[in-house]
Amino acid sequence: ALETGTLKKLVLARQLQVELSDSIDSVALFYHACTLYPHAFVSLVSTPQSGTWLMATPETLLAKRPVGDQWYTMALAGTMDHSGPWAEKNCLEQRLVVDYIETCLQPHVVQLQRSMPYVRQAAQLYHRCTDFLFVLKPQVNLGNVIADLHPTPAVCGMPKALAQDFILREEHLHRAYYSGFTGPLNVWKTTHF
């Protein structure tokens, strides 16, 4: 599909199963992740239905600050393991995500502001990042905004519908919560996914 040009981008997952001889202290692991990744969104969720999931991501899908009407998202794409000049492939990949996010937001927002791309470090990796600030139009349903944005090209591909179909047909593993989103919804007037 990539060779024929049907898909501009495709992100496939792979699964690794490891058997551990000792039990894991998930809370200690959570605190360790918070220390290792101070600028990431780190969360630990454990329920009988879903199991235990430790998540750490430098990416913000959608966030609202506690004061005012301003929302935020980012286009985080293009990855290198060192700082330096960016390859054209990484610049193009990030530009695709910027265009995708702008297109998704247009029907839902006013006062859309976009930063210039900059380098954002996440642990030992460097990413190209563009920030978006905006105000939601009155009567906009937050669920519709999320449905338009997610999954982003960074975890699925482009065009979204074709990439999703390809993944469901060819990947042969259940992603469960992998590449999903989590976070507080209107907790102390803050939302952060």
What are these regions (language model features)?
Residues 10, 41-45, 176-183:
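A short glycine-rich, hydrophobically flanked beta-strand micro-motif that places a catalytic Asp/Glu
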Residues 11-15, 106, 187:
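Short hydrophobic alpha-helical segments that form membrane-spanning helices or hydrophobic packing faces
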Residues 14-96, 189-193:
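An anion-binding catalytic pocket shared by soluble metabolic enzymes
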Residues 15-16, 47-53, 102, 117-125, ...:
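A glycine-rich phosphate-binding loop feature that marks nucleotide/adenosyl-phosphate handling sites
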Residues 18-19, 72-168:
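Contiguous alpha-helical scaffold segments within structured protein domains
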Residues 156-162, 166-193:
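Glycine-rich, small/acidic residue-mixed loop/short-helix segments
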